[in-house]
Design a protein with these regions (language model features):
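N-terminal anchoring/stem segment of glycosyltransferases
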Residues: 2-3, 12-117, 167, 236-244
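Extracellular/periplasmic catalytic domains that process cell-envelope and extracellular macromolecules
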Residues: 49-52, 137, 152-156, 226-231
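A structural signal for well-ordered alpha-helical scaffolds and beta->alpha junctions
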Residues: 67, 71, 100, 154, ...
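A structural signal for short, well-ordered beta-strand segments and their strand-loop junctions
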Residues: 86-88, 120-123, 144, 209-214
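Short, solvent-exposed loop/turn segments at secondary-structure junctions
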Residues: 92-93, 126-127, 149-150, 167-168, ...
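GT-A fold catalytic core of metal-dependent nucleotide-sugar glycosyltransferases
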Residues: 101-156, 160-166, 170
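Catalytic core and acceptor-binding pocket of nucleotide-sugar-dependent glycosyltransferases
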Residues: 105, 170-248
Length: 248
């Protein structure tokens, strides 16, 4: 079954510091299995044709902006692999920062909308190259990619987010939403930094179980190709904000 919702009208629906004590933190070595420096497809890339019935891929884009075209590419890639999804269009919130900070509210809404599904959020400028089999019988509350870059260590990347549908993730989203609002005047602050902060806090205070996604599931098309030259991406992100954030 393919789930897509389309509509009309006004709203169409179709600095984290390095912390080696954080259990999410894992330095990447060239021979580390996390880096996947292999020319052969990983087991996670092999698809037996069976879909994951309780997984819903969700995402959003701003209507009448270049992101609408990006979303069409995402939806096409989801349809190719018969991946159940709900990708919607929203009105422009007033700028790139406001639009990205909406992610916390969106995830909370999707958890309520799809109560029988775990969620896999992806930014609308991403595409799926194969079926995300990693999430079959995936056991955790939340998973994101924690990535070491030259300019920032252990950065939480929110382009791909797995969330189990439970009260812990609802609580996480509410705290994330609240922190986004508190920091909205700080234009240098990113929503994914806020998410990383809340994940760390909820691991300590709320028993949240998190995982570090493989690089192939949050694969930034150029930056991560430099880090993992032989990786075979499952979900590839094309960073449309680099050219669009000043226009939207």
């Amino acid at each position: 079954m393919i789930f897509r919702r389309r509509g009309s009208g006004k709203s169409k629906k179709i600095v984290v510091s390095p912390n080696s004590n954080n259990k999410n933190y894992k330095p990447i070595k060239s021979n580390d299995s996390v880096s996947r420096d292999s020319k052969k497809p990983l087991p996670a890339h092999k698809w037996d044709g069976k879909t994951i019935n309780n997984l819903m891929v969700v995402g959003y884009y701003t209507i009448n902006t270049p992101y609408e075209q990006e979303a069409k590419k995402l939806i096409s890639s989801l349809d190719k692999f018969n991946i159940t999804h709900d990708v919607i269009g929203i009105p422009n919130k007033g700028g790139w920062q406001a639009n990205t900070r909406y992610k916390a509210t969106f995830m909370l809404e999707m958890l309520d909308k799809h109560k029988d599904h775990n969620l896999l959020y992806v930014d609308c400028d991403a595409v799926f190259h194969t079926y995300p089999t990693l999430f079959r019988n995936y056991e955790c509350d939340v998973a994101v990619r924690w990535q070491d870059f030259r300019w920032r260590q252990n950065e939480c990347l929110s382009g791909t987010i797995f969330m189990a549908n439970n009260q812990k993730t609802r609580s996480l989203c509410r705290r994330w939403e609240s922190l986004n609002k508190k920091t909205q005047s700080n234009k240098a602050n990113l929503e994914q930094w806020n998410l990383g902060e809340i994940i760390k806090d909820h691991e300590k205070t709320n028993g949240l179980i998190s995982k570090n996604l493989p690089a192939e599931y949050t694969f930034i098309f150029d930056l991560m190709r430099q880090i993992y030259p032989n990786a075979i991406p499952v979900i590839e992100h094309f960073q449309a904000s680099r050219k669009n954030k000043r226009r939207v």
